[in-house]
């Protein structure tokens, strides 16, 4: 837990509806990072189903784009850690990725599938992290395409009283998303402790939420 991020507080302060009352009382809201990642393969549908069934209402996931422009749920640049496949996500087509199984035999999922799962679930907080590194995999036009597709896919089925955020450590992605959708909820991920510098950096980008280290 040494690299524990200040996202629990962000989650509590940002929730809407019934959870907003909890936030006003400064109650910390627990959430599932990549789903139930220790009990199930991370970022798979069983992982998210299990954590939701366990009563969690806050979640985080990661989005990358395949070579042919499909949005797949994957934290790592390659599939090597979770599957027998060693390839880079951005070099694969959606068809190729759909043929890959995790080491536990689960399917890799695409963003529309995850959005569909949460479409009928009220008062949920989700961080859809934009994974757009390495930078060379997402030049400006591809980055624009990515941001537009992510936003449209996620927001198309968002329940009215849920809160969906778009975090990233890539400032290019945050700026592009802000340019395309000025009212979007963003979160800046920084590997440094919270300090005046990080706060001012977020304010300068028009971002109200930080994901940063507590220690330091």
Question: Predicted regions: what is each one?
Answer:
Residues 1-8:
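Bacterial N-terminal signal peptides that target proteins for export
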Residues 9-15:
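Hydrophobic helical h-region of N-terminal Sec-dependent signal peptides
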Residues 9, 22-216:
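Phosphate-group recognition and catalysis centered on beta-loop-alpha active-site segments
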